[in-house]
């Protein structure tokens, strides 16, 4: 297998974008929506190929997370997927590690939302499960997002976070987290 490639969305060919969508659809089934795919675009992609076949992917996009009265420049991880036949071989960790320098040098916070199944990967990579509340800045104001509580991982690059204060994500279509 080749090393992990890093490419901005603008550098990807239509075939690359189609391969990302196909991989994510296979990994997540009906839970991966058009909005989820859209969320993964506009930033950098970590891509792992086996020959010409995309077998692992993770995207890092810029977002603003409000916390303690500040709008934190956040590298938000999206669309982490590994082909079913090569799972548990370190490919998810490889694409995540490839994004680490971009988070460390480009943002004050790294964040991601995950399922229970994905949580062990992020914990093993040094991400911290956010213990505090979550919310979203919606068109109707700040609204709690209790469904996201317990499923957000963070990597604080630019200082400590106060778990007594909520993490408030910016608004977007589909799942806000």
Model-derived segments and their meaning:
Residues 143-177:
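Acidic/histidine-enriched, glycine/proline-rich intrinsically disordered or flexible terminal extensions
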Residues 20, 122, 127:
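Conserved active-site tyrosine of GNAT-family acetyltransferases
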Residues 77-87, 117:
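A short, internal acetyl-CoA/4′-phosphopantetheine-binding micro-motif in the GNAT/acyltransferase core
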Residues 1-14, 167-176:
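Conserved N-terminal entry element of GNAT/NAT acetyltransferase domains
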Residues 101-115:
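Conserved GNAT acetyl-CoA-binding A-motif
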Residues 86-98:
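Conserved acetyl-CoA pyrophosphate-binding loop and the N-cap/start of the following alpha-helix
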């Amino acid at each position: 297998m080749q090393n992990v490639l890093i490419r901005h969305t603008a550098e990807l060919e239509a075939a690359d974008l189609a391969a990302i969508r196909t991989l994510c659809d296979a990994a997540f089934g009906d839970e991966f929506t058009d909005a989820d795919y859209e969320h993964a675009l506009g930033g950098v992609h970590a891509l792992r190929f086996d020959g010409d076949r995309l077998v692992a992917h993770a995207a890092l996009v810029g977002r603003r997370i409000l916390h303690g009265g500040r709008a934190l420049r956040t590298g938000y991880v999206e669309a982490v997927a590994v082909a079913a036949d090569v799972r548990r071989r370190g490919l998810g960790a490889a694409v995540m590690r490839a994004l680490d320098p971009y988070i460390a040098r480009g943002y004050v916070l790294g964040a991601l939302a995950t399922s229970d199944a994905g949580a062990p990967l992020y914990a093993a990579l040094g991400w911290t499960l956010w213990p505090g509340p979550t919310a979203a800045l919606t068109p109707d104001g700040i609204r709690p997002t209790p469904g996201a509580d317990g499923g957000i991982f963070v990597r604080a690059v630019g200082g400590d976070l106060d778990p007594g204060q909520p993490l408030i994500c910016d608004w977007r279509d589909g799942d806000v987290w």
